[in-house]
């Protein structure tokens, strides 16, 4: 194998791995609010394949820099709400609050079919803390659900057009609104990094150059 062919093979393998990594993780911004301005990224939700086959991991991060200061103590997320694909309801008992494990903070619990407030409506699941257990980072794992994928948890309730995720975030400065907490929601996909697109474009050009070279021989 010549150097050109080997380079093309390495590039193809690298792009495949990058594509696989991207396929195994999806991220969304919560950029809507009933208290602060819409269109600002207030929190980021990442859903990914777990380390254990079949598990799905959630990471929910409050983007602290988006909030008016000074921040209180404690500041952070107090609830987080999300949905699942209703196809997972079969077989009966396939999915429920008991499938959500390894919650951190560990004082939080899971409730079902709760209203997120702020006009954002009901969600299938809500991870819930309290005023003293607010957090800037929530993580948990969904385990033991047959047939789910990361996409099973990125949709509106019952497949509708509502927001995918919602959170109650509290403890920021009152600012001009007079409030120190609000409801936040969103389903805006985080853009794929430009480097991935550039790499993919480069690989396509490399493949075209190789074909032209072969045709000229």
Predicted regions and their residues:
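A short, hydrophobic C-terminal helix/tail in secreted or cell-surface proteins
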Residues: 191-209
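Positively charged, low-complexity intrinsically disordered regions
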Residues: 7, 184, 211-213
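Sec/Tat signal peptide C-region and signal peptidase I cleavage site
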Residues: 19-23
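Bacterial N-terminal signal peptides
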Residues: 11-18
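Mature extracellular "passenger" or substrate-interacting domains of secreted, surface-exposed proteins
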Residues: 24-189
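Detector for intrinsically disordered, low-structure N-terminal pre-sequences
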Residues: 9, 100, 189-191, 216
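C-terminal membrane-anchoring or membrane-association module
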Residues: 207-217
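Bacterial N-terminal signal peptides that target proteins for export
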Residues: 1-8
């Amino acid at each position: 194998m010549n150097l050109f062919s080997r380079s093309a093979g390495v590039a193809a393998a690298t792009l495949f791995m990058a594509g696989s990594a991207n396929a195994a993780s999806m991220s969304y911004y919560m950029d809507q609010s009933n208290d602060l301005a819409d269109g600002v990224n207030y929190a980021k939700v990442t859903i990914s394949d777990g380390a254990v086959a079949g598990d799905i991991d959630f990471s929910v991060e409050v983007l602290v820099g988006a909030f008016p200061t000074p921040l209180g103590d404690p500041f952070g997320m107090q609830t987080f709400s999300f949905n699942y694909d209703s196809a997972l309801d079969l077989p009966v008992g396939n999915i429920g609050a008991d499938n959500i494990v390894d919650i951190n903070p560990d004082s939080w619990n899971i409730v079902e079919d709760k209203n997120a407030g702020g006009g954002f409506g009901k969600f299938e699941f809500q991870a819930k803390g309290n005023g003293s257990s607010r957090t800037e980072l929530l993580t948990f794992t969904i385990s033991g659900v047959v047939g789910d994928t990361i996409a099973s948890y990125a949709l509106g309730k019952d497949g509708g057009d509502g927001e995918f995720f919602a959170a109650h975030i509290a403890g920021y400065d009152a600012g001009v609104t007079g409030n120190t907490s609000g409801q936040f929601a969103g389903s805006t996909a985080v853009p794929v990094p430009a480097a991935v697109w550039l790499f993919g474009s480069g690989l396509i050009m490399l493949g075209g150059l190789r074909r032209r070279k072969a045709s000229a021989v």
